[in-house]
UniProtKB/Swiss-Prot annotation:
Keywords, comma-separated and alphabetical: Ribonucleoprotein, Ribosomal protein, RNA-binding, rRNA-binding, tRNA-binding
Source organism (scientific name): Pseudoalteromonas translucida (strain TAC 125)
Subunit structure and binding partners: Part of the 30S ribosomal subunit. Forms a loose heterodimer with protein S19. Forms two bridges to the 50S subunit in the 70S ribosome.
GO biological process: translation
Disordered: region residues: 94-118
Cited InterPro entries: Rbsml_uS13_C, Ribosomal_uS13, Ribosomal_uS13-like_H2TH, Ribosomal_uS13_bac-type, Ribosomal_uS13_CS
Gene: rpsM
Described purpose of this protein according to its UniProt entry: Located at the top of the head of the 30S subunit, it contacts several helices of the 16S rRNA. In the 70S ribosome it contacts the 23S rRNA (bridge B1a) and protein L5 of the 50S subunit (bridge B1b), connecting the 2 subunits; these bridges are implicated in subunit movement. Contacts the tRNAs in the A and P-sites.
GO molecular function per UniProt: rRNA binding; structural constituent of ribosome; tRNA binding
UniProt KW tRNA-binding keyword: yes
Keyword field contains Ubl conjugation: no
Protein name: Small ribosomal subunit protein uS13
Family listed: Belongs to the universal ribosomal protein uS13 family.
């Protein structure tokens, strides 16, 4: 298994799919990285030479991925909560942020139903 950005990328998959195992890299960004490095999308990760893998690591290193991206997202959410803006309040109360109805539905965000005590 090739190690890129601290992640073991599966050898048996095509390069375009294998790179999506890294948090922060989807199909579009994966295709852009491969186009910039000149690697064919259908090449398997296991078939890449060490020099090519180094070029790929450098290209992936230009983007914010994995731990840095996760940290950035959590800090952004924390910043919204500290500001006390509408989105921050919705995060704090574990409710949907983008205007969805909450009278019914929204169970995924709100969690399991709380029983009514009589």
């Amino acid at each position: 298994m090739a190690r890129i950005a601290g992640i073991n990328v599966p050898d048996h998959k095509h390069a375009v799919i294998g790179l999506t195992a890294i948090y922060g890299i989807g199909k579009t960004r994966s295709k852009a990285i491969l186009a910039a490095t000149g690697i064919a999308e259908t090449t398997k990760i296991g078939e890449l030479s060490d020099e090519t893998l180094d070029v790929l690591r450098d290209a992936v290193g230009k983007y914010t991925v994995e731990g840095d991206l996760r940290r950035e997202v959590t800090l952004n959410i924390k910043r919204l909560m500290d500001l006390g803006c509408y989105r921050g309040l919705r995060h704090r109360r574990s409710l949907p942020l983008r205007g969805q109805r909450t009278k019914t539905n929204a169970r995924t965000r709100k969690g399991p139903r709380k029983p009514i005590k009589r």
